[in-house]
From Swiss-Prot:
PROSITE patterns: CBM1_1, CBM1_2
Biotech use, per record: AA12 family proteins are an attractive component of cellulolytic enzymes for use in biodegradation and biomass conversion or as an anode catalyst for bioelectrochemical applications. Moreover, direct electron transfer (DET)-type bioelectrocatalysis of the PQQ domain from PDH has been used to create an amperometric L-fucose biosensor for the screening test of cancer using urine.
Keyword terms of this UniProt record: Calcium, Disulfide bond, Glycoprotein, Heme, Iron, Metal-binding, Oxidoreductase, Secreted, Signal
SUPFAM superfamilies: CBD9-like, Cellulose-binding domain, Soluble quinoprotein glucose dehydrogenase
Region Disordered, residue ranges: 211-242, 659-689
One annotated GO molecular function: oxidoreductase activity
Source organism of the structure: Coprinopsis cinerea (strain Okayama-7 / 130 / ATCC MYA-4618 / FGSC 9003)
Name by which UniProt lists this protein: Pyrroloquinoline quinone-dependent pyranose dehydrogenase
InterPro entries for the chain: 6-blade_b-propeller_TolB-like, CBD_sf, Cellobiose_DH-like_cyt, Cellulose-bd_dom_fun, DOMON_domain, PDH_beta-prop, Quinoprot_gluc/sorb_DH_b-prop
One Pfam family named in its UniProt record: TrAA12
Residues noted as binding Ca(2+) in the record, renumbered to the chain: 449, 451
Length: 726
C-alpha cells in the first residue's frame, strides 16, 4: 500500500504548477458559452457555468463539461484544487454512453465513491469518433466539509484537473468503477465571477434539450420533391395524438406531409401574428389589435389555459423572449419596447422604449430577433415605403434594411432607428419579415420581393410578374460584426422563371433589373449586390422561418401568400433541406440555380386555388413559426383565420431528455476505510502496446512499454513514464 499511495501522491505533485486560466468559450455544438480551461498537451477541456449570485448567495450547483480525444480513458477534476478532502468528479464514455461519478480521497490513494453531489448527464454528451464529452449538472456541489470547504461565490478559486490518456476504468459500464491512476494532472485558478451568468437557466434548458453527441453520417434531409409523390412511407407513430381537447375544428381543410399530424390548438384569436415560446414552454402570441396573450401547454403541446400578458393595441407583429427568460421585446410599426417578464406567472412589467422612428404606411410590421449567441444584441427590420422605394439605395434612408442594437448600450428613453446605435446588418432588403439564427449565431432573413414586375425589351414593357421575381433568403452574417450587406433593392431582383427573359439568357438566381439600361443594369447588380442563398416561388410572401432542432437540419418557412398572382400560390408551410458546417453555419443542400425544386410541402390548404390575398383569404395563411424545445411540435399562426396549429412529428421528439444516473448512496470514506480499488501497479492495462500519451514505464509498472510510431517513452519521475511525440 505504501507504493500505491506514494505513486498517487507524486502524480499529484504537478498540482502545484498552475497551467493558465479559463477563458470564455463558445461551444458551437450547443450554442452555449462556458468558462473553459484548455490543456494543450492532452487536447482536453474543462468547462464551467455558474448561476448568478443574488444578495451574496448563489444556488449550490453548476454546469460542467469534460471534453477530450475519443481515445482518452477518463477525465476528472477536483472542485477544491487538491486531491485530498475535496469532491472529485470523474467522467468517461463507455462505447457511446457517457458516465460520471463523484469521488472522495482522504489520502493520496485511489478515491472512493462520494454520495454528496447529485449528478445529471445533459445533452450533447457522448462521442462522435473524434472527441468524447460529458456535459453534466452538479447539484449540492459548491459547499462541503474539509479541504477548501467549497467554491466561493465571487473571487478566485483553485480547481484541479486529472486525465488518463488511454485506459478506461476497470468496469467502464459502472459509474462507480475503480480507476487507473491519471497520466496527467495539474491545477489552475480562475475568477468564479467570470463564470457566473444570468443566462444559467437558459443554458441549462439548451443543454437539457440538446441531442446526444454521436458519430456516423448525419440524418438525411427530406426529399426535395413534394412528399405527395416521392416521400418515403411515414415512420410508425410513437404517439396517438389526433387533436387537442377543447380546441375548435380547423376552419379550412388542410393536408400535412407524411410522418406528421396537424390540429388547431387555438381558434377565435384576433389576427395572430408573431409567436414564440418562453423558457417554461408557454406559448406567446401577438394578436394584432389586442396585445400579447400567453397560453400554457400540456405534455401533448395542447393549450390548457390562456391569459392576456400585455394589453396593447399598438403591438402588431414582432415578439421575442430573451434567452434568460426574463425579458421580452415587442414592437408596433413605429416603436420597439422591452418588458421585464416572469415566465412562471406570464406577467410583463416595466415597459421601456428601445427604438423609435420606424413608421411607414406601406410595410408596417417589424420583426424582433434577440441573438442567442449574443443575448445583448437584437435585430429589427423596417420594410420599404412603397413597391419601389428609390431612397433605400442609401443606408441612411432607414428603410428596406435590418439593424442590430445593443440593449446594454441604449439610453433609458430609447434611440431613433437611424441613430448610430443601430448598426446596419443588411440593406437593399425590400421587406425581410422573417429573421432567424443558425447554430453559429449567423442571422438569416427572407425577403418579400417586388410586385408587378416587368422587363423593358426593345423599348417595350413586358409583364413578367406572374413568375418573377423570386422570394429569397440571405445570410447576413454575424450580428456582433455587422457588414451592411447590400441585397440589391430597389434595382436588383432575382430570376425565378428564365423563359420570361427574351433579351438575354438567364437561369434561376441571376440578377435582373426592370430596365436593363442606364446606371442600374444586370451587370451593375452582379458587381454590387450580394446574392441570396436560397430562392422560393414568387408572390408566396414568406413571413417567418425557423431551423429544425437536433438532427433536423432543414429550414421551415411560413408562406403567407400574396394578392399579386393568379393562380395564387403560397398559403402553406414548406421545408428546405440544408446542412451545417463544422462551425454551425447553415446553407441549403441545393445550389442557388436549383432552388426551384429544392423544397417540399409540409402543411398546405386542401385547395390552394381558392385562396385569396384579400379579406378572409378563403384559407389559412401561415404567419409565425416556433418549435417546441424537444423538436416534436411546430406551432403555426394563421392571422386571417384566427388560429394557431400544432404540427406534430409522429416519430416523437428528436431532442432527447438528459440521461440521469440513479443516486449514489455509498457513504463518504472515513480515514480508516481501505481503498476500494487495487492500485495500477498490480493491474496491467489490457493493451499489448501503448498509445500516444499513455503510461509506458515506471517503478512497479507491468503494463505495455512499447510506444506507437513517431513517439518515445519519456520518464516524468521514478514512478511514471509516458509515450510522447518524438
Amino acid at each position: 500500500m505504501r507504493s500505491s499511495s506514494l505513486a498517487w501522491a507524486l502524480g499529484l505533485v504537478a498540482l502545484a504548477n498552475a497551467q493558465g486560466s479559463p477563458t470564455q468559450w463558445y461551444d458551437s455544438i450547443t450554442g452555449v458559452t462556458f468558462s473553459r480551461f484548455y490543456q494543450q498537451d492532452t487536447d482536453a477541456s474543462w468547462g464551467y457555468i455558474f448561476p448568478s449570485a443574488s444578495g451574496g448567495q448563489a444556488p449550490d450547483e453548476f454546469i460542467g463539461l469534460f471534453q477530450g480525444p475519443a481515445s482518452a480513458g477518463w477525465i476528472g477534476n477536483s472542485l477544491g484544487g487538491s486531491m485530498r478532502n475535496n469532491p472529485l468528479l470523474v467522467g468517461w464514455v463507455d462505447g457511446s454512453t457517457p458516465r460520471i461519478s463523484a469521488r472522495w480521497a482522504t489520502d493520496y490513494a485511489p478515491p472512493s465513491i462520494y454520495s454528496g453531489p447529485r449528478l445529471t448527464i445533459l445533452g450533447s454528451s457522448g462521442t462522435n469518433g473524434n472527441i468524447q464529452r460529458i456535459v453534466y449538472r452538479c447539484q449540492n456541489c459548491t459547499r462541503w466539509t474539509g479541504g477548501a470547504g467549497g467554491i466561493p461565490t465571487t473571487g478566485s478559486a483553485v480547481f484541479g484537473w486529472a486525465f488518463h490518456s488511454t485506459t478506461k476504468p476497470l468496469t467502464p459500464s459502472d459509474p462507480s468503477s475503480g480507476l487507473y491512476r491519471h497520466s496527467h494532472a495539474a491545477q489552475y485558478g480562475f475568477d468564479i465571477g467570470n463564470a457566473r451568468t444570468t443566462l444559467y437557466d437558459y443554458y441549462l434548458q439548451q443543454l437539457t434539450n440538446a441531442p446526444p453527441l454521436s458519430g456516423g453520417a448525419p440524418t438525411q434531409p427530406p426529399t426535395q420533391q413534394p412528399p405527395t409523390t416521392t416521400a418515403p412511407p411515414p415512420p410508425p407513430p410513437s404517439s396517438t395524438f389526433v387533436s387537442c381537447p377543447g380546441a375548435p375544428q380547423p376552419r379550412y381543410q388542410m393536408n400535412v406531409a407524411n410522418g406528421f399530424r396537424v390540429a388547431p390548438v387555438l381558434g377565435g384569436l384576433t389576427m395572430p401574428r408573431g409567436i414564440t415560446l418562453d423558457t417554461r414552454g408557454n406559448l406567446l402570441v401577438v394578436e394584432r389589435g389586442r396585445g400579447l396573450t400567453g397560453h400554457t401547454l400540456d405534455a401533448n403541446g395542447c393549450v390548457t389555459s390562456s391569459k392576456v400578458v400585455i394589453q396593447d393595441t399598438q403591438i402588431n407583429h414582432g415578439i421575442d423572449v430573451h434567452p434568460s427568460g426574463r425579458r421580452i421585446i415587442a414592437s408596433s410599426g413605429d416603436i420597439a419596447w422591452s418588458w421585464d417578464y416572469d415566465p412562471a406567472t406570464m406577467t410583463a412589467t416595466n415597459r421601456r422604449t428601445l427604438v423609435t422612428g420606424m413608421n411607414n404606411f406601406y410595410h408596417f410590421t417589424r420583426t424582433v430577433h434577440i441573438s442567442r449567441k449574443y443575448p445583448n444584441l437584437f435585430a429589427l427590420n423596417v420594410g420599404s415605403d412603397g413597391n419601389i422605394d428609390v431612397p433605400t439605395r442609401q443606408q441612411n434612408s432607414g428603410r428596406a434594411q435590418i439593424r442590430v442594437f445593443d440593449y446594454d448600450q441604449l439610453p433609458q428613453n430609447g434611440v431613433p432607428f437611424v441613430s448610430q446605435y443601430g448598426r446596419v446588418l443588411g440593406y437593399g432588403l425590400r421587406n425581410d419579415v422573417g429573421i432567424t439564427e443558425d447554430r453559429a449565431g449567423n442571422i438569416h432573413s427572407i425577403e418579400n420581393s417586388l410586385d408587378n414586375a416587368y422587363r423593358m425589351v426593345n423599348g417595350q414593357r413586358r409583364d413578367i410578374h406572374t413568375n418573377n421575381p423570386a422570394e429569397k433568403v440571405y445570410n447576413l452574417g454575424d450580428p456582433s460584426n455587422p457588414r451592411a450587406i447590400f441585397g440589391g433593392y430597389p434595382d436588383c431582383y432575382t430570376v425565378w422563371e428564365p423563359s420570361d427573359f427574351t433579351d438575354s439568357p438567364k437561369q434561376p438566381g441571376d440578377w435582373f433589373t426592370q430596365d436593363n439600361s442606364g446606371q442600374y443594369t444586370d451587370a451593375w447588380c452582379n458587381a454590387n449586390a450580394v446574392k441570396p442563398t436560397l430562392l422560393l416561388p414568387p408572390h408566396t410572401a414568406p413571413l417567418d422561418m425557423k431551423f429544425g432542432l437536433g438532427n433536423d437540419t432543414n429550414l421551415y418557412v411560413a408562406l403567407h401568400g400574396s394578392w399579386n398572382r393568379q393562380p395564387p400560390q403560397g398559403y402553406k408551410v414548406v421545408v428546405v433541406p440544408g446542412q451545417y458546417s463544422a462551425s454551425g453555419e447553415w446553407s441549403p443542400t441545393a445550389p442557388l440555380a436549383q432552388s426551384r425544386t429544392a423544397w417540399s410541402d409540409l402543411l398546405t390548404n386542401r385547395n390552394e386555388n381558392q385562396c385569396s390575398g384579400f379579406g378572409n383569404a378563403n384559407c389559412f395563411r401561415p404567419v409565425g413559426l416556433v418549435w417546441s424545445a424537444d423538436g416534436q411540435n411546430l406551432y403555426v399562426s394563421s392571422d386571417t383565420s384566427g388560429e394557431v396549429f400544432i404540427i406534430k412529428r409522429m416519430s416523437g421528439p428528436i431532442v432527447q431528455p438528459p440521461i440521469t444516473q440513479p443516486p449514489i448512496t455509498t457513504s463518504p470514506p472515513t480515514p480508516t476505510t481501505p481503498p476500494v480499488v487495487q492500485p495500477p501497479t498490480t493491474v496491467a492495462p489490457p493493451q499489448a502496446s501503448q498509445t500516444l500519451w499513455g503510461q509506458c514505464g515506471g517503478q512497479g509498472w507491468t503494463g505495455p512499454t512499447l510506444c506507437p510510431a513517431n513517439s518515445v517513452c519519456r520518464e516524468s519521475n521514478q514512478w511514471y513514464s509516458q509515450c510522447v511525440p518524438a
